[in-house]
Amino acid sequence: MLSSELFDAIEVNAARTGNHKRAAVRMSRLAVQASQGGMSRAEAHMRAGEQWLLADDPEEAVEQFQKAMADAGPTFDDPRVPLARAMFALGRTDDAEALVRELRESGALTQPRTCDLVAELLTEQGDLRTALDWATAGVEACLRGEDRDELKLLLRLRYRLRVDLGLPEDDYDKMLDNKKAQRADPAAGK
């Protein structure tokens, strides 16, 4: 039975040694053996794919992310995001952009974590305007829900994007300023 603890240990060892290929190979083999009761096979393939990306082997990563999608089991993150990252790394820009469109059309703009991941991916690709749209959608999704940790990340990302785009401060940027003030003076903002 696969466990997240086992995969965590493999990831920590890979980070310590820098040998992500070894971790990716091991995780890929373990993912095939996944059974009921532990980590989902889809999540195992996702984590293996992430290690393949860290090992600079996006082709193997694509295979693992596609297996995660085909398995359709539960995953911590949407496998289409890292699959798009691997596609970009392979120069398959049209395929990667199609995945981002698919995410948008499937309602991912209501999921703060996915918005954060897509915004980061698009920032890496230099598409700051679209990244800003995703970050803004993520902030709005957080404000409708309870995800305050993701809200902080999205507000910071959104602020950096707006600065890079030369845009003036807006109400969401001011929320970030209020959070800074509250950390400096807990009585502020009450």
What residues fall within each predicted segment?
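Tetratricopeptide repeat
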Residues: A24-V25, V62, M69, E97, ...
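Alpha-helical adaptor scaffolds
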Residues: R41-L117
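N-terminal alpha-helical interaction modules that lie
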Residues: M1-D56, K174-K190
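TPR/TPR-like (Sel1-like) alpha-helical repeat modules
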Residues: E105-A108, E124-E146, Y159, K174-K180
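Boundary/linker segments of alpha-helical solenoid repeat arrays
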Residues: G73-D78, G107-C115, E140-L154, R183-A188
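Hydrophobic/aromatic packing residues within the alpha-helices of TPR/SEL1-like helical repeat arrays
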Residues: M27-A31, F65, V100, A135
